[in-house]
């Protein structure tokens, strides 16, 4: 709609709208998050519903400024199998709760925060073994009566040519997947998770930066969503201590990555630059 404006001006305008939208929504969400602390179940349920509506409004406003300052063509397949009433959450590192404004929003929206101990830490404190999984399992008790899905970014970092070469990745379009995080989630919530939503994103004109998005330089985004079952043998194993289970789990994750790499190959052919 504002395509007649220079990209730099559109970027500044979009950034301003994003900040204003976030601050206004937070000003309403924060009091509700405090009220939600009261140990009154009906009140907590009501606050949760209102907070979710605020989050949906925030997303709608973000979609609005993206349409205003840009003209992205979305090609999405598979979203019809997603359930609007389901809960799609990210497992977040505990340190992220301290991110200004957004950390409180994540907490208020019941995004589970996880704290994982490194091998070096466990070597110094063996008594802590298993406590991180148990803590996460307790944090997820609230989801036993609520449909929930957990997002996990297996590559763990943004793909660059340098990182791809450094890893000597066997995949054309992907970095090597890190299976520890998803194994941790399945160990903590295995009884509640039976399938995974495999999301693949392709940018025909190359991976954009956040500034590219703000300034209206993103032309097209191709998204493919696939529902895949989680093998029962991948549930309930001890990824940290059981070497056989860890090898089998990594093999399963690698097979998912091989399929994703082939899909990206096809998407690159079907949606070349400028398509």
Regions found by a protein language model. Give the residues of each.
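Exposed, interaction-prone extracellular/peripheral surfaces
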Residues: 141, 185, 269-273
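A Trp-anchored, charged/polar loop motif used as the substrate-binding/catalytic surface
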Residues: 128-141
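A generic local structural motif
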Residues: 75-78, 136-138, 183-184
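Accessory terminal regions of nucleic-acid processing enzymes
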Residues: 19, 236-275
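Flexible, glycine- and charge-enriched loops at secondary-structure boundaries
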Residues: 51-52, 129, 171, 175
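A cross-family acyltransferase "interaction/gating" segment
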Residues: 100-119, 144-238
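Catalytic core of membrane glycerolipid acyltransferases/transacylases, capturing the structured
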Residues: 33-60, 68-71, 77-127
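N-terminal membrane-anchoring alpha-helices
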Residues: 1-71, 273-275
């Amino acid at each position: 709609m504002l395509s007649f404006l220079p990209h730099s001006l559109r970027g500044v305008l979009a950034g301003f709208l994003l900040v204003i939208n976030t601050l206004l929504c937070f000003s309403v969400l924060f009091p509700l998050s405090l009220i939600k602390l009261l140990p009154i179940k009906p009140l907590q349920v009501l606050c949760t519903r209102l907070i979710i509506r605020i989050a949906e409004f925030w997303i709608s406003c973000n979609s609005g400024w993206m349409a205003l300052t840009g003209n992205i063509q979305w090609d999405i397949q598979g979203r019809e199998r997603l359930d609007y009433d389901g809960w799609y959450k990210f497992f977040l590192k505990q340190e992220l709760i301290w991110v200004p404004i957004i950390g409180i929003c994540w907490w208020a929206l019941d995004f589970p925060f996880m704290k994982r101990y490194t091998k070096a830490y466990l070597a110094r404190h063996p008594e802590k073994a298993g406590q991180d999984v148990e803590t996460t399992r307790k944090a997820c008790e609230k989801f036993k009566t609520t449909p929930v899905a957990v997002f996990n970014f297996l590559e763990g970092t943004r793909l660059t040519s340098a990182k791809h070469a450094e890893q000597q990745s066997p995949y054309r379009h992907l970095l090597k997947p890190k299976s520890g995080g998803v194994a941790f989630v399945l160990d903590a919530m295995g009884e509640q998770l039976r399938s995974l939503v495999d999301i693949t994103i392709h940018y025909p004109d190359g991976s954009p930066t956040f500034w590219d998005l703000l300034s209206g330089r993103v032309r097209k985004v191709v998204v493919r969503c696939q529902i895949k079952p989680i093998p029962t043998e991948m549930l309930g194993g001890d990824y940290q201590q059981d070497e056989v289970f860890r090898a089998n789990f990594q093999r399963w994750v690698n097979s998912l990555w091989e399929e994703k790499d082939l899909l990206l190959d096809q998407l690159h052919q079907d949606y070349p630059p400028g398509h």
